[in-house]
Curated annotation (Swiss-Prot):
Subunit relationships: NDH is composed of at least 16 different subunits, 5 of which are encoded in the nucleus.
Transmembrane regions: 8-28, 30-50, 58-78, 98-118, 150-170
EC number(s) reported in the record: 7.1.1.-
This protein's UniProt keywords: Chloroplast, Membrane, NAD, NADP, Plastid, Plastoquinone, Quinone, Thylakoid, Translocase, Transmembrane, Transmembrane helix, Transport
Entry membrane topology: Multi-pass membrane protein
Catalytic reactions on record: a plastoquinone + NADH + (n+1) H(+)(in) = a plastoquinol + NAD(+) + n H(+)(out); a plastoquinone + NADPH + (n+1) H(+)(in) = a plastoquinol + NADP(+) + n H(+)(out)
Family annotation (InterPro entries): NADH_UbQ/plastoQ_OxRdtase_su6, Nuo/plastoQ_OxRdtase_6_NuoJ
GO CC annotation terms, alphabetical: chloroplast thylakoid membrane
KW tRNA processing (keyword) present: no
Protein purpose: NDH shuttles electrons from NAD(P)H:plastoquinone, via FMN and iron-sulfur (Fe-S) centers, to quinones in the photosynthetic chain and possibly in a chloroplast respiratory chain. The immediate electron acceptor for the enzyme in this species is believed to be plastoquinone. Couples the redox reaction to proton translocation, and thus conserves the redox energy in a proton gradient.
Coiled-coil features, chain-numbered ranges: none
Protein name: NAD(P)H-quinone oxidoreductase subunit 6, chloroplastic
Localisation per UniProt entry: Plastid, Chloroplast thylakoid membrane
Protein backbone atom coordinates (compact mmCIF):
# COMPACT_ATOMS: atom_id res chain seq x y z
CA UNK A 1 0.00 0.00 0.00
CA UNK A 2 2.87 2.35 0.82
CA UNK A 3 4.49 1.75 -2.56
CA UNK A 4 1.22 2.55 -4.33
CA UNK A 5 0.76 5.83 -2.43
CA UNK A 6 4.39 6.76 -3.14
CA UNK A 7 3.84 6.02 -6.81
CA UNK A 8 0.67 8.16 -6.89
CA UNK A 9 2.55 10.98 -5.15
CA UNK A 10 5.34 10.64 -7.71
CA UNK A 11 2.86 10.95 -10.59
CA UNK A 12 1.21 14.00 -8.99
CA UNK A 13 4.60 15.69 -8.52
CA UNK A 14 5.59 14.82 -12.08
CA UNK A 15 2.33 16.37 -13.29
CA UNK A 16 3.02 19.60 -11.36
CA UNK A 17 6.59 19.73 -12.66
CA UNK A 18 5.30 19.26 -16.22
CA UNK A 19 2.52 21.87 -15.85
CA UNK A 20 4.94 24.33 -14.22
CA UNK A 21 7.47 23.90 -17.02
CA UNK A 22 4.77 24.40 -19.65
CA UNK A 23 3.57 27.51 -17.79
CA UNK A 24 7.09 28.93 -17.84
CA UNK A 25 7.38 28.41 -21.58
CA UNK A 26 3.91 29.28 -22.85
CA UNK A 27 2.74 32.26 -20.77
CA UNK A 28 3.29 35.62 -22.44
CA UNK A 29 3.23 37.49 -19.13
CA UNK A 30 6.67 37.11 -17.60
CA UNK A 31 5.36 37.43 -14.02
CA UNK A 32 3.16 34.36 -14.56
CA UNK A 33 6.16 32.57 -16.03
CA UNK A 34 8.17 33.35 -12.89
CA UNK A 35 5.32 32.07 -10.69
CA UNK A 36 5.16 28.83 -12.67
CA UNK A 37 8.93 28.54 -12.34
CA UNK A 38 8.43 28.73 -8.57
CA UNK A 39 5.81 25.96 -8.82
CA UNK A 40 8.28 23.82 -10.76
CA UNK A 41 11.05 24.41 -8.22
CA UNK A 42 8.71 23.61 -5.33
CA UNK A 43 7.55 20.41 -7.01
CA UNK A 44 11.15 19.32 -7.56
CA UNK A 45 11.84 20.01 -3.87
CA UNK A 46 8.91 17.79 -2.89
CA UNK A 47 10.25 15.14 -5.26
CA UNK A 48 13.60 15.26 -3.44
CA UNK A 49 11.72 14.89 -0.15
CA UNK A 50 9.88 11.85 -1.53
CA UNK A 51 13.23 10.32 -2.52
CA UNK A 52 14.51 10.70 1.05
CA UNK A 53 16.91 13.61 0.63
CA UNK A 54 15.66 16.11 3.20
CA UNK A 55 18.68 18.38 3.01
CA UNK A 56 18.49 18.67 -0.77
CA UNK A 57 14.77 19.39 -0.54
CA UNK A 58 15.26 22.21 1.98
CA UNK A 59 18.17 23.61 -0.02
CA UNK A 60 15.99 23.55 -3.17
CA UNK A 61 13.27 25.53 -1.41
CA UNK A 62 15.63 28.06 0.16
CA UNK A 63 17.89 28.60 -2.83
CA UNK A 64 15.64 28.21 -5.84
CA UNK A 65 12.12 28.94 -4.67
CA UNK A 66 13.19 31.64 -2.26
CA UNK A 67 16.24 33.36 -3.65
CA UNK A 68 16.33 32.67 -7.38
CA UNK A 69 12.62 33.19 -7.98
CA UNK A 70 12.66 36.48 -6.03
CA UNK A 71 15.75 37.53 -7.98
CA UNK A 72 13.94 36.79 -11.25
CA UNK A 73 10.92 38.86 -10.17
CA UNK A 74 13.20 41.79 -9.23
CA UNK A 75 15.02 41.49 -12.56
CA UNK A 76 11.69 41.58 -14.37
CA UNK A 77 10.68 44.70 -12.48
CA UNK A 78 13.99 46.38 -13.35
CA UNK A 79 13.92 45.32 -17.01
CA UNK A 80 10.58 46.99 -17.68
CA UNK A 81 12.20 50.43 -17.51
CA UNK A 82 12.46 52.72 -20.54
CA UNK A 83 15.66 52.65 -22.55
CA UNK A 84 18.35 55.21 -21.74
CA UNK A 85 20.69 56.92 -24.11
CA UNK A 86 24.37 55.99 -23.87
CA UNK A 87 25.42 59.61 -24.22
CA UNK A 88 23.77 60.28 -20.84
CA UNK A 89 26.45 58.14 -19.20
CA UNK A 90 29.36 60.23 -18.00
CA UNK A 91 32.43 59.23 -16.03
CA UNK A 92 33.04 61.08 -12.81
CA UNK A 93 36.19 61.02 -10.64
CA UNK A 94 34.54 58.76 -8.07
CA UNK A 95 34.20 56.08 -10.77
CA UNK A 96 37.98 56.13 -11.27
CA UNK A 97 38.56 55.91 -7.50
CA UNK A 98 36.21 52.96 -7.11
CA UNK A 99 37.82 51.28 -10.12
CA UNK A 100 41.27 51.61 -8.51
CA UNK A 101 40.06 50.31 -5.13
CA UNK A 102 38.29 47.37 -6.75
CA UNK A 103 41.29 46.58 -8.94
CA UNK A 104 43.58 46.52 -5.90
CA UNK A 105 41.11 44.33 -3.99
CA UNK A 106 40.75 41.97 -6.95
CA UNK A 107 44.53 41.76 -7.40
CA UNK A 108 44.99 40.97 -3.70
CA UNK A 109 42.39 38.20 -3.79
CA UNK A 110 43.87 36.67 -6.96
CA UNK A 111 47.36 36.80 -5.43
CA UNK A 112 46.13 35.07 -2.28
CA UNK A 113 44.39 32.36 -4.31
CA UNK A 114 47.43 31.74 -6.52
CA UNK A 115 49.98 31.65 -3.68
CA UNK A 116 48.00 29.41 -1.30
CA UNK A 117 49.23 25.77 -1.29
CA UNK A 118 45.79 24.25 -1.96
CA UNK A 119 47.13 20.77 -2.69
CA UNK A 120 48.62 20.41 0.80
CA UNK A 121 45.44 21.68 2.45
CA UNK A 122 43.16 19.35 0.49
CA UNK A 123 45.31 16.25 1.18
CA UNK A 124 45.38 17.03 4.91
CA UNK A 125 41.61 17.54 5.00
CA UNK A 126 40.91 14.28 3.11
CA UNK A 127 42.81 12.32 5.77
CA UNK A 128 40.78 13.99 8.53
CA UNK A 129 37.51 13.44 6.65
CA UNK A 130 38.09 9.71 6.26
CA UNK A 131 38.88 9.31 9.97
CA UNK A 132 35.65 11.02 11.12
CA UNK A 133 32.36 9.19 11.57
CA UNK A 134 29.38 11.42 10.83
CA UNK A 135 25.99 10.77 12.39
CA UNK A 136 24.04 12.27 9.50
CA UNK A 137 24.69 13.09 5.85
CA UNK A 138 23.91 16.74 6.61
CA UNK A 139 26.88 16.91 9.00
CA UNK A 140 29.13 15.41 6.33
CA UNK A 141 27.90 17.92 3.73
CA UNK A 142 28.47 20.79 6.17
CA UNK A 143 31.97 19.58 6.96
CA UNK A 144 32.83 19.31 3.27
CA UNK A 145 31.43 22.80 2.57
CA UNK A 146 33.72 24.26 5.20
CA UNK A 147 36.78 22.15 4.38
CA UNK A 148 37.31 20.73 0.89
CA UNK A 149 34.74 22.93 -0.85
CA UNK A 150 35.54 26.18 0.96
CA UNK A 151 36.92 27.96 -2.13
CA UNK A 152 33.86 27.42 -4.38
CA UNK A 153 31.60 28.17 -1.41
CA UNK A 154 33.35 31.49 -0.76
CA UNK A 155 33.44 32.38 -4.46
CA UNK A 156 29.70 31.76 -4.68
CA UNK A 157 29.07 33.98 -1.66
CA UNK A 158 31.26 36.68 -3.23
CA UNK A 159 29.28 36.42 -6.48
CA UNK A 160 25.99 36.78 -4.60
CA UNK A 161 27.38 39.79 -2.71
CA UNK A 162 28.39 41.44 -5.99
CA UNK A 163 24.90 40.83 -7.42
CA UNK A 164 23.32 42.35 -4.32
CA UNK A 165 25.56 45.42 -4.47
CA UNK A 166 24.77 45.83 -8.17
CA UNK A 167 21.03 45.68 -7.47
CA UNK A 168 21.38 48.34 -4.75
CA UNK A 169 23.38 50.59 -7.09
CA UNK A 170 20.76 50.25 -9.83
CA UNK A 171 17.95 50.98 -7.39
CA UNK A 172 19.75 54.02 -5.96
CA UNK A 173 20.42 55.45 -9.43
CA UNK A 174 16.73 55.23 -10.26
CA UNK A 175 15.82 56.82 -6.93
CA UNK A 176 18.25 59.70 -7.52
CA UNK A 177 17.00 60.23 -11.09
CA UNK A 178 13.36 60.33 -9.96
CA UNK A 179 13.96 63.09 -7.39
Amino acid sequence: MLEQSAQITLFVLDFFIFVGALGVVFFNNIIYSALFLGLTFLSVALLYLLLGSEFLSVAQVIIYVGAINVLIVFAIMLVNKPEFDKKDMIWVPIDLKSFCVNFILFSTIVTMIVTTPWKLLVNNIDVKLNSLNFLSPIAKIGYQFLSTLVLPFELLSLLLLIALIGAVIIARRELIEDT
